[in-house]
Design a protein with these regions (language model features):
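Short Cys/His-rich "knuckle" micro-motifs
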Residues: 145-146
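The canonical Cys-X-X-Cys-His
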Residues: 130-141
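Bacterial N-terminal signal peptides that target proteins for export
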Residues: 1-10
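Short, linear, compositionally biased motifs with a strong N-terminal bias
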Residues: 13-14
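Extracytoplasmic c-type cytochrome modules immediately beyond a signal peptide or single-pass transmembrane anchor
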Residues: 24-129
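N-terminal signal peptide c-region/cleavage motif recognized by signal peptidases
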Residues: 17-20
């Protein structure tokens, strides 16, 4: 049986159009990068490196709140990835990891609430709590660059 001449290019095109499946570690990294992209502009304001615009800051805080929990759903039991910086302690100490997640989500909610008040001192304080929460989790559960 002979395949039509145009079938091979069509199959190649079909293969290229299929999404590339990312590893669990890559998916988590992409999700955390979204958080970082939402968080960084607020940091410029919190450190007086960018002007404070209340409506814009509220949108940024809300965007962060909407995506904050997403990466944590990707730490499934069989998702250890050799390329990832995720430490094995995530899976061996799940209660501690869950506590860090909750601290982060609570801090993000508080930042969102502070943003709505327009009180820049409260915003800066809340931003610092979120940043500290990130650091605390990274110190315990994120390994060095590979």
């Amino acid at each position: 049986m002979t395949l039509p001449k145009n079938l091979a290019p069509a199959l190649a095109l079909l293969a290229l159009s299929l999404p590339v499946l990312a590893s669990p570690g890559e998916e988590r990294q992409q999700s955390f990068k979204k958080i970082l992209r939402a968080f960084e502009p607020m940091g410029l304001v919190a450190r007086d490196r960018a002007p404070y615009r209340k409506d814009e800051f509220i949108k940024q805080a809300d965007a962060l709140k909407q995506i904050a929990a997403a990466p944590f759903t990707l730490f499934t039991p069989n998702s250890i990835d050799a390329k990832s910086r995720a430490k094995p302690e995530i899976w061996s100490q799940p209660e501690k990891f869950k506590t860090e997640q909750q601290k982060f989500l609570t801090a993000v909610n508080e930042l969102d609430s502070a943003a709505k008040t327009g009180d820049i001192a409260s915003i800066k304080r809340s931003y610092g709590v979120v940043a500290q929460s990130c650091k605390s989790c990274h110190d315990s559960f994120r390994g060095p660059e590979k």
